[in-house]
Amino acid sequence: MSLPSSTIRPVTRRGFLGLAALGAASIGLSACATVGTGPAYVEPRPPEGPDASYGSYVTMYGPVYDGGFEIPAVPIERIDPQFLRQVVSDPTGEPAGTIIVDTSQHFLYLVLGNGQAMRYGVGLGRQGFEWAGRANVQWKQKWPKWTPPKEMIARQPELAQYSEENGGMPPGLDNPLGARALYIFQNGEDTLYRLHGSPEWNSIGRSVSSGCVRLMNQDIIDLYDRVPGRAPILVTSGIGMS
């Protein structure tokens, strides 16, 4: 298959050393597989993970060490390629720096200018469909806390331990807001609309039962780094509709 390329994060020294260690371990295991004087026969195994056609995506969606947490790699070979991060021709007509969430297609665009946009696949929860319009990113947060609303706690009493009174759920890999969150305000008031990370890569490109707009953690980190404070955002059910 042929996939478009995009900007990638360089492999960290820690990641390189980890790969080197895995290579050394593989050599050691190969030596252990040999018994006696003749060569050992090892049953071939089918290849695992993405093949070479995924190119830079292997690194783009590889493991990330961030904020004291190790974000695992995304099995990109199990995701529809259209939902992987990529530069596309801008279909929105919006000014550079604008975020557009197209809820009908499960895409988020960040307009780059010069007729191009960065496109991300998103998963949409019920709250992701409940609000539409123009607003701004009021503030951004790395590894945010999560506080379930009272209505959710009423449905799932086990979440009471993360209530506002109890300080919310601390940051971490199991936190529903993931590695980053962007908080959307309209005319100075919180819309309760969020763009946030998620470890649930299999929800990208789908509509799920709860939540706002979720991106893979690797993608929300990329978006967070690109978007300045007060960035304009348009949420619409179709490009060209506002």
Question: PLM features: residue spans?
Answer:
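N-terminal secretory signal peptides
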Residues: 1-31
